[in-house]
């Protein structure tokens, strides 16, 4: 009897497994051909809309998939629609095939069984994701991803200022308060539930909290008032010195950018480290604009795409999600003039050609280096979002 060496058995099993994996993906590609994917995603940025249009053209030409960008203002409205479809027992032929999502919205979809999956382990490009150095690709606002959404890009809160208008910038929220008191009317932030406004108050809360520990656990109603007291105390001090004396707030980062350009405010914000450089290149902001983060860091996270449970084009959605993770698509997304959205890939896992292309990416004049952006504060538990927004509106939106 011939004994097969153990190493050959291992190699044989690996080959069989790889073939099965490859065959499954080829079947997905075949089924995706001719499908129409309704991609529900925020439509408030022209450059992002253009990028999505480019990506849609690529999968149309290569795979025969039609991607329709359904521009939405608040992805929470889409979740409400999916909940209604589930209540009506519409388990197939849903109105949404793919959605841009993260944080509390992902948590809500996961808890209400509105997600298709797990699926990301089936995507060939998933193996290129930097799961080692980017923990937020695996944990979304403390909610385990569990292969139920595919990482798309990275984000970190940055502040924008015009170096021609101010000689220094604050390096903490306490310094921002002092800055506002010294420059009345020149500081503001968007009103929650604007994503930017909610992020701003979360940043405040993380900086002024007596202890951060409760913020990384689900909200306890009995402890909410005590835990958030330092936040409201800080905002009560800040608002009288803000733009329009804190009686009115901007709608989002784009409006803040315009106010910064007009000289009405001295500090704006963004969740894209390349945003200011893009704005300079597009003529939206002067060349003297620069960016910074706080001394102890700022909130950072990952944004994802997810497939609803009743998608009528699950295969097409998976192929599109896989393309969005390709080195080609991630590189283009990282170019400042295109979007400037940081990659979720581990560049060291890429081919020499792709690695070189990422290394040659231009760093805009107002863009912080990776070393300068290395202090990332993890998002609080997703349950804090709704609780903070509700209390903020009760206090200040009268």
Specify the residue positions occupied by each region the protein language model found.
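Bacterial N-terminal signal peptides
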Residues: 6-17
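Boundary at the C-terminal end of the N-terminal hydrophobic targeting segment
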Residues: 18-22
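Conserved C-terminal helix/tail region of periplasmic/extracytoplasmic solute-binding proteins
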Residues: 24, 258, 365-398
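Short, polar/charged alpha-helical segment
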Residues: 25-33, 40, 45-66, 159
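Extracytoplasmic ligand-binding site segments that recognize negatively charged/polar headgroups
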Residues: 42-54, 70-79, 92, 96, ...
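Short, well-structured alpha-helical segments in soluble
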Residues: 82-91
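Extracytoplasmic/periplasmic substrate-binding proteins
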Residues: 243-306, 310, 356
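Mature extracytoplasmic/periplasmic domains
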Residues: 298-299, 303-372
């Amino acid at each position: 009897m011939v004994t097969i060496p153990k190493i050959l058995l291992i190699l044989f099993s690996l080959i069989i497994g790889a073939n099965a994996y490859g065959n499954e993906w080829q079947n997905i590609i075949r089924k995706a051909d001719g499908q129409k994917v309704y991609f529900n995603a925020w439509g408030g940025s022209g450059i992002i809309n253009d990028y999505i249009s480019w990506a849609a053209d690529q999968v149309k030409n290569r795979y025969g998939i039609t991607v329709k960008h359904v521009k939405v203002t608040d992805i929470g409205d889409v979740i409400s629609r999916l909940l209604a479809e589930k209540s009506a027992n519409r388990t197939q032929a849903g109105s949404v095939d793919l959605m841009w999502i993260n944080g509390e919205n992902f948590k809500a979809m996961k808890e209400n069984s509105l997600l298709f999956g797990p699926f990301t382990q089936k995507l060939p490009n998933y193996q290129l994701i930097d799961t080692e150095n980017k923990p937020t690709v695996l944990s979304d606002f403390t909610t385990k991803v569990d292969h139920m959404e595919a990482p798309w890009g990275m984000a970190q809160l940055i502040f924008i200022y015009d170096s021609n208008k101010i000689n220094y910038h604050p390096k903490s929220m306490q310094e921002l308060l002092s800055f506002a008191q010294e420059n009345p009317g020149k500081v503001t932030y968007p009103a929650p539930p604007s994503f930017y406004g909610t992020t701003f108050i979360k940043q405040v809360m993380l900086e002024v909290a007596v202890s951060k520990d409760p913020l990384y656990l689900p909200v306890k109603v009995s402890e909410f008032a005590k835990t958030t007291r330092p936040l409201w105390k800080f905002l009560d001090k800040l608002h009288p010195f803000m733009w329009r004396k804190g009686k009115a707030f901007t709608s989002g980062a784009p409006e803040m950018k315009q106010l910064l350009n007009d000289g009405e405010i001295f500090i704006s914000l963004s969740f894209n480290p390349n945003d200011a450089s893009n704005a300079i290149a597009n003529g939206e902001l002067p060349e003297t604009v620069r960016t910074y983060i706080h001394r102890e860091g700022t909130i950072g996270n990952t944004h994802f795409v997810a497939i609803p449970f009743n998608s009528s084009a699950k295969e097409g959605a998976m192929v599109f999600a896989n393309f969005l993770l390709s080195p080609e698509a991630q590189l283009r997304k990282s170019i400042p003039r295109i979007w400037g959205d940081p990659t979720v890939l581990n560049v060291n896992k890429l081919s020499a050609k792709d690695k070189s292309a990422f290394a040659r990416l231009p760093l805009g004049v107002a863009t912080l280096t990776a070393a300068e952006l290395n202090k990332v504060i993890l998002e609080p538990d997703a349950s804090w979002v709704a609780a903070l927004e509700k209390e903020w509106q009760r206090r200040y939106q009268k």
